[in-house]
Amino acid sequence: MKNFKYFAQSYVDWVIRLGRLRFSLLGVMILAVLALCTQILFSLFIVHQISWVDIFRSVTFGLLTAPFVIYFFTLLVEKLEHSRLDLSSSVNRLENEVAERIAAQKKLSQALEKLEKNSRDKSTLLATISHEFRTPLNGIVGLSQILLDDELDDLQRNYLKTINISAVSLGYIFSDIIDLEKIDASRIELNRQPTDFPALLNDIYNFASFLAKEKNLIFSLELEPNLPNWLNLDRVRLSQILWNLISNAVKFTDQGNIILKIMRNQDCYHFIVKDTGMGISPEEQKHIFEMYYQVKESRQQSAGSGIGLAISKNLAQLMGRGFNS
């Protein structure tokens, strides 16, 4: 089969090299000779005599019809060869495209592997930093809290409150940064456990009052009666959400007050933060929970990173609850 294809292709190449006109003339000559020889042999073996009239008639018929047959045959061969060349070109182009796609896919795979490795390295680094960072930070918070229970004058107490609240705030900021990476990797988890709810609210009140006092604002809690003393929740995550909301309210409130209102609807609790700040336009409210978004109308463009509210919304949704402006 391979030899047949080889000889067929060689024949086609030979026809193409000769050209349509020369091949037609050569074909006519060959057919004329064949027709003459065939007629002579036929006459000798069948009739036992040579009829020159029949020979002349056969040769004349062949010479009249052969050029057309050979011409169209040559035309067909040329078209088939052009089609073969076009097909071969298309196959080569397709092979090149496949090779390019394979190379591009290989590069993409290598880039993804590198990205995954960088992500793993980043996660490992953040986990290490988190451990190394929280240990001394918790020590600062704990020791400052112990010292606040001693007898101190007003100046000393204010200094210690500043240290305590600053350490707590720094911890929440660092939690936002850690959670930012966990949210991207869909690895954030909740740690629900029985929590002293009044103690949690007291901690919130202490740092919120301190933040508000620095700007001559008034912070207050509005609690619905008969709230339970113990709740099964993630204390760290809830504190993180409330810290983001309250600190955001403090940043964008120049005068007046900030209120944290807590209401209960059966087993659902609503935490509402109100302030007397400049407010946010309805158009801006559509975007404030987007990652890295900052209010354009704000006079304090550099006041935050734009991740606190976005992370808080993700945490609230992880708890199975809504988060609205």
From Swiss-Prot:
Record bears the keyword Nucleotide-binding: yes
Ranges facing Cytoplasmic side: 1-26, 79-325
This protein's record includes keyword Cell inner membrane: yes
Reaction it catalyzes: ATP + protein L-histidine = ADP + protein N-phospho-L-histidine
Periplasmic face residues: 48-57
Pfam families: HATPase_c, HisKA, HKR_ArcB_TM
InterPro entries listed in its UniProt record: ArcB_TM_sf, HATPase_C_sf, His_kinase_dom, HisK_dim/P_dom, HisK_dim/P_sf, HKR_ArcB_TM, Sensor_HK_Regulatory, Sig_transdc_His_kin-like_C
Protein name: Aerobic respiration control sensor protein ArcB homolog
Lineage start: Bacteria, Pseudomonadati, Pseudomonadota, Gammaproteobacteria, Pasteurellales
Designated gene of the protein: arcB
